[in-house]
Amino acid sequence: TDLRGLDRNTDTVVWLGHSTYFVQLGGRRLLIDPVFSTYASPVFFANRAFEGTNLYTAEDMPDIDYLLISHDHWDHLDYATATALRSKVGQVVCPLGVGAHFEAWGYGKETVFEGDWYSVLEGKGGFAIHILPARHFSGRSLTRNKTLWAGFALVTPEHRIFFSGDSGYGKHFAEIGARFGGFDLAMLDCGQYDENWRYVHMMPEDTAQAAEDLRARALLPGHVGKFAIAY
């Protein structure tokens, strides 16, 4: 699909692999957790993308109104991708502490909206991006939990979309579902088949329950299909 050729007034969601999503909603174009590199780690030989899964590059993206980053792990925040997108991004939306990466990588401070859980970035016509709780952790290289992790709700008068980011199952899903009155679509963490990780990622049965808790009309599982992260 030629993403640049899509009518921006047509609401759509395109999963680009792993946790990367291209979203058009309410006349806005959003890109969530883009990783277009062939690896998701500090070194090129680790956590390599499966062959044939890098179908898009930063050059294939249209201008992006909002770049959403859920947390600063390598498979969600990629330096090469972020810098390649810089000239196309209107505003970055991220949880607390993550904005420092973008400022260090040449983004203007005025282009970064950084918020705590339950912060809201409001636009015209009833459009809003809500930064919401997740059960996870953060860190790059030797740092750990110096920045926040989050999910997002994308809201217009016509539609509500939820993105979990990385998250284990928890009561926050039911609380979010009640707060927003349900969602048209939930894009949820799924498929890291390691019981030792179940408090920071969801097994498939957890994902299904989270979708019910969120009162989602449709479920799009993610965090699969590109990297072998769990063993």
Task: Report each predicted region and the residues it spans.
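Metallo-beta-lactamase
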Residues: D2-N9, C94-H159
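Metal-dependent catalytic neighborhoods of phosphoester/phosphodiester hydrolases
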Residues: D78-K88, I229-Y231
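Cap/insert and terminal regions of metallo-dependent hydrolase folds
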Residues: M61, Y66, Q91-A100, G170-Y231
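C-terminal structured domain segments across diverse proteins
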Residues: L132, V155, H159-F162, S167-G170, ...
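Active-site metal-binding loops of divalent metal-dependent hydrolases
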Residues: P34-F36, D72, A134-R135, G165-S167, ...
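Short hydrophobic/aromatic-enriched beta-strand-loop microsegments
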Residues: I32-D33, V92-V93, K109-W117, D184-D189
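Pre-active-site segment of Zn-dependent metallo-hydrolases
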Residues: T1-T10, L16, T20-D72, Y79-A84, ...
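Active-site-proximal beta-strand elements of phosphoester/diester hydrolases
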Residues: T12-W15, L30-D33, A128-A134, R160-D166
